[in-house]
Amino acid sequence: MNYSPIRITVCVAILAALAIMDVVNKGRNATRWREYAFLVLCVAVAMVYGIINDQITCRISWEYFYYGKELATILGPQIPPDPGALSVQAVRIGAAATWWAGLIIGAVMLIANNPSRRGPQLPYARLLARLPIIFAITVVVAATLGVAGYDYLLNWISPDFQNLAETNLWRPHRFMAVYGIHLGGYVGGALAAVYAVSSIHRQRRSAV
């Protein structure tokens, strides 16, 4: 999947345009714009998480980004790389790696809230109230796997990680901590999505 800033911008612009068109065409009867606005907000929240996450982790292990994310050709041969340039690239990577996760989570929440026999739809305020919890779940899981990575508990995932530890290459404790944080972000996001869908279903059933 191409995570270029252009694609992110186009995706958000399309959703925003659809929302505006819905309001223009239907006026007060417009309803779909709320869905598009909700998706845009979910994408924005995910990107904020990704940017903050990578601003922190690029300071824990510049090696993870320089070597692991293959930024050497962009940042140049200076070791360690210029902190400012690294920070800029971390913003790009963080936003690009998370926007689609926000879109997916927002979409599954809307699907879970679609009209059905299980109960009345929840107002969008109830859906929005789940976003901080989703954010918190993701952070907790990311931090947990970050600690696991630091303690080499994730080295079994790849022989390359075992080699890093054995050769003491690229400050391996820090490198693996950042790997764990990033892995935990995706695992946490998936768990948070499951929580969101199940809680929406449960709340809809209880309202019957």
What is each of the regions a protein language model found here?
Residues 6, 80-103, 169-192:
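Hydrophobic alpha-helical transmembrane segments
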Residues 7, 19-22, 47-60:
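Alpha-helical transmembrane segments of multi-pass membrane proteins
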Residues 9-22, 136-147:
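Hydrophobic core of alpha-helical transmembrane segments in multi-pass integral membrane proteins
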Residues 9-20, 99-109, 183-198:
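Hydrophobic cores of alpha-helical transmembrane segments in multi-pass inner/ER membrane proteins
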Residues 24-34, 106-134, 198-208:
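Cytoplasmic juxtamembrane regions at transmembrane-helix boundaries
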Residues 41-55, 129-152:
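Hydrophobic alpha-helical membrane-insertion segments
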Residues 64-68, 143-166:
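Juxtamembrane non-transmembrane "cap" segments at the membrane-aqueous interface
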Residues 64-86:
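Perimembrane loop-to-helix junctions flanking transmembrane segments
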